[in-house]
Design a protein with these regions (language model features):
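Basic, nucleic-acid-interacting segments
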Residues: 100-136, 141-158
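Aromatic/basic-lined ligand-recognition segments
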Residues: 138-207
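Beta-strand elements of well-folded, non-transmembrane domains
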Residues: 56-63, 77-85, 132-136, 155-161, ...
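Short, conserved charged micro-motifs
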Residues: 214-224
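A common structural junction motif
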Residues: 229-236
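Hydrophobic, proline/glycine-rich low-complexity stretches
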Residues: 2-126
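Conserved small/polar residues in nucleotide/adenosyl-binding loops
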Residues: 242-244
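Long C-terminal interaction/binding lobes of large macromolecular proteins
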Residues: 202-207, 223-227, 239-240
Length: 244
């Protein structure tokens, strides 16, 4: 649209508190995603993932004892973009997800959302991640005292061009291990100087990624128990100090 140099002087420069968005006005808004893009310049290059990263909201999850837990969650939703398309309406990533915000979340819910992303954003592939910190009550190794342990978790879902869906759970398990450097220095002190030296411990993280079979389920509690059985030295949430 051509404008004269002084046309901006005629534009309203004040906020209009009485303006109402009507259905007709909403329909008149430009929609680049669903409009023809022949008039838009740019290289015909596909993009593997485009979307919104880390929008936050509280979601409901099943707790370790079957109770409902509301947990703050960071969500990332992306779709693929074909070479003949110039973009997507980013807000639809959030708006579609918000239609499921009252569901009890699990990797199974992701399949429904991913299909909505493909259909309503007209994409060949879609990906979804939900990252959250999951609380579980844990008993200390020696004292018998209990406290909450928080586990960083991520539910990930992927749908491909053939509508095949992959469900992946990422689970972080923090445990105590002997520092290898301190261990070697301690052994050196014993051998060379006949000196008693004790290596210190350190926090270590095991990141477990499990792809769930389409016909199977696994809970975060089961994953936690598998980690405890494999690594017996989880960091402790409650200690009883003994004064000598």
């Amino acid at each position: 649209m051509e404008t004269s140099p002084n046309s901006s002087d005629k534009l309203i420069r004040e906020y209009d508190p009485n303006f109402q968005v009507t259905p007709e006005y909403r329909d008149s808004l430009p929609d680049v995603q669903n409009s023809g893009c022949a008039e838009l310049d740019g290289a015909r290059v596909p993009i593997l993932q485009v979307g919104i990263s880390g929008f936050r909201l509280p979601l409901c999850y099943v707790g370790p004892d079957g109770e409902n837990l509301n947990i703050e969650t960071a969500v990332t939703g992306t779709v693929s973009l074909d070479a003949d398309k110039k973009g997507i309406n980013m807000s639809r990533i959030i708006r579609i997800f918000y239609e499921y915000k009252n569901e009890t979340f699990s990797p199974e819910i992701f399949a429904r959302i991913l299909r909505e992303y493909k259909d309503r954003l007209d994409s060949k592939e879609a990906r979804l991640k939900a990252q959250f910190s999951y609380p579980m009550m844990q008993e200390s190794l020696r004292s018998g005292l209990q406290g909450f342990q928080f586990y960083d978790c991520c539910f990930e879902g992927i749908i491909d061009r053939a509508d095949r869906i992959r469900k992946i759970i990422h689970f972080d398990f923090v445990y105590s291990s002997a520092c290898p450097c301190a261990s070697e220095l301690s052994e050196h002190a014993r051998e060379k100087r006949n000196l008693l030296a004790i290596p210190h411990s350190q926090r270590s993280k095991a990141r477990i990624s499990v792809e769930v079979h389409p016909d199977k389920e696994i809970s975060l509690l089961e994953l936690r128990d598998l980690c405890i059985n494999g690594l017996q030295t989880e960091t402790q949430v409650m200690l009883s100090l003994i004064h000598i």
